[in-house]
Amino acid sequence: KLAEILMMPGKTVSVEQGMEIPVTHDIGTIRLDGDQGNSGVGIPSSRLVGCMTHERAFGADTMELGHIDYSFKPVKPVVSNECQAMEVCQQNMVIPLFYGAMPNMGLYYTPDGPFENPGDLMKLFKIDKAKESMEHAAEHLTRDTVWVMQKLFASGADGVNFDTTGAAGDGDMYGTLYAIQALRKEFSDMYIEAGMAGEMVLGMHGELEYNGVRLAGLWPHEQAPLVAKAGANVFGPVCNTNTSKTSAWNLARAVTFIKAAVGASPIPCHVNMGMGVGGIPMLETPPIDAVTRASKAMVEIAGVDGIOIGVGDPMGMPISHIMASGMTGIRAAGDLVARMEFSKNMRIGEAKEYVAKKLGVDKMDLVDEHVMRELREELDIGIITSVPGAAKGIAAKMNIEKLLGIKINSCNLFRKQIA
C-alpha cells in the first residue's frame, strides 16, 4: 500500500473519498505574518486576518492563536493583549480556535530564566543539582501554563494546544502533564491537545514519573496512555525525520511508529506533520509531492484521527495537507467533526457517525461541498462565503451547540456578558 502511494504518478495525491480527517495546527498565524528566515512568508497582517484566512481561504477545520515568541513564558507579560485578540477572533470565527504555545522549559534556565542550566551543572558533575534545577523549572512551567490558560479560557478560547511537549526532556513533559491535569480538573469543557517534540522522551533527569510511569525513554505508543490519563482530548505523536535518508524510508518508519501509537491510544491521535516530523522532509518550503503522500499514508495506513499541521510555508503545509486529507472546515463539516473529537474524545469514525446522524445525512456527505453548503445555510451554522443576514461567529456557534448537543466556551462567555 505504501509503495503504491509513493509511486502514484501525479504530483499531488489525496485520500480516498470518505477517509478525510480534521486538521489542527502548530505555530498559528506565524506561517503567514512571521518572517524570521524560516517558514514564515512575512505578509503584514493582523492575527485576526491570519486566523480568518485559515478558516475561509484555506478550509481549515480548526485554528489556533499564538504569540510571535510562541512559548507560554513570554506570554505572561502580554496576556491581556492575547486575551483581547482571542475575544475578537472568537467573535468573528466559527471553527474551533485554540491558544497554542510551547511549554519550552529551556526558557526557565539561565541566562533566560531563574534556574541554573542543568547542562552546565552536569558538565561539572553536579548531577543532583542539575536534577533539582529541572524539578524547579517544571514546577514553574506548570504554574505559568495554567495561569496563562486560565486567562485565555476566560476570554473564550476553545482550548489549548501544547506544541512540542518534552522539547527539554522528561522534565518538560512532566511539567506539561501536570499542567494538563490541573487544567482538566478546573475546566471540564476545555479542548486540550498535547503534541510531542520528538519520538522519544529524552531522559535529561531520568527519574521523573507520572502516574507511576517513568517518563525517560517513552516512545509514542507509551506516551499516548499517559497523555490521556492526564486529561488531554487529543494526542499528537511524533516520528522524527532522518535527513540522511530518503522520503520513502522516513515515511515507512513514521507510519510504523504512528500506527502503533494510534492502536495504543485511548484518545484521538492527530499526528504531527510539520517539516522534520511525520515523514515530512526538513525544508522550509516542504515539497508538495512528499507532503501529500505522507498525509495520505498517515490516514489510510496508520489510521490517524487527524493531522496537526506544523512548520512550513502556507502552500507546503496547510494547503497541501488540507487538499490531500482535510475535511475543509466550514466548506463542509470539518469543524463539526473536530468539535466532537475534542468535546467527547470521539475517534474519527464515531465523530463522523455522530455528526452525520445529527445532520440527517450519510457520512460521505460530510465532505460534499454542495450538500453541506445548502445544509449549513439552512441550519444557519456558518458558511464560508459572506451572505448578508446569515449567522456568523458567535451566532453560528450557538446554533452548532444546539445541533451537536455540546457547549462552546466562546458562547458561554457571550451569554455571561449579556446576562
UniProtKB/Swiss-Prot annotation:
The keyword Lipid metabolism does not apply. One of its GO terms (molecular function) is dimethylamine methyltransferase activity. One of its GO terms (biological process) is methanogenesis. It is an enzyme of class 2 (transferase). Pathway: One-carbon metabolism; methanogenesis from dimethylamine. Catalyzes the transfer of a methyl group from dimethylamine to the corrinoid cofactor of MtbC. No evidence for expression of this protein has been found after growth under presumably inducing conditions. Belongs to the dimethylamine methyltransferase family. This is Dimethylamine methyltransferase MtbB3. It comes from Methanosarcina barkeri. The lineage of its organism: Archaea, Methanobacteriati, Methanobacteriota, Stenosarchaea group, Methanomicrobia.
